[in-house]
Amino acid sequence: RPPGKQRGTSDIGFADPTMVGTRLDSLTRAWSLGMEIGSHFNGHFCGASGVNTWTSADWVSEIDQWNDFVDNWRLYNPDLQDHPPLPFSSQVAKGGRTPCLEGDPQAIRSAYRQAGYTYDASQVGDLQWPRRIGGLWEIPLQRIKVPGQSTLIASMDFNFLVNQNGGETEAAPEVCQQIETDTYEAYRSALDAVMSSNRAPLILGNHMNDWVCGAYTNALTR
C-alpha cells in the first residue's frame, strides 16, 4: 500500500502481466553484466500529493514494500513458478532515485540510512564528483547545456523531452533527427567538459525507450 494512497494504486499505471518474465530476464542479464541494481520505488507518485509529502517512516514503508516485491515476486506472479530465479535479493540495492527527483531530502536520507543504503541519486547538481551528505553519497544528475539554448537541463532523457518536444513522445522524422543530433552534441560536450577539467563521472539518465523515434537512446548509444 503506497503511503497516503489506496492499496494497489500507481501514478503511472501498470505493465502487462505477460511482461514480468521478460523483465526478470532483463534484470538477470543486467546483473550478470555487472550493472548496479537500485530502487526507483513503486508507484511513482509525484506532485503536491505525492512523495513530497512523505515522512521518513513513509519512505521506510516504501523501501520495505519494494524489497518484498523483489524477494517474493513468485508469490505475486503464480503463473511464473517455473521461471528461473533472480540471481540477487533486494539486499543488493544500496541506493535509489526518487520519483521525479522529488521528496524531502532529510526524510529520504533518514530512511536510506535505516535501510542500509549508501547513496542517493535523486538530486541535481553540476558536472561534479559525488559528495557525502548526511552519511550518504550524493550522486546527482548533472545540469548540461543543450545546443542553441542558454538554459541548463538535468541530464535525463525525460527532462530533454520536455525541453525539446513539450513532453510529447511522438514527432515527425525530421524533428526526431534534430532532437537526436542536439542531444548527442549535448552529451558529447558534457563528456568533453569533464574530461578536460575535473574528470568527474558523467551521469546520463535514460529510460531505454523509443520516445521521438528513439532519439535519446540513439544519442546515448552513439
Predicted regions and their residues:
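Active-site beta->alpha N-cap acidic-glycine motif
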Residues: 1-38, 43-48, 56, 65-104, ...
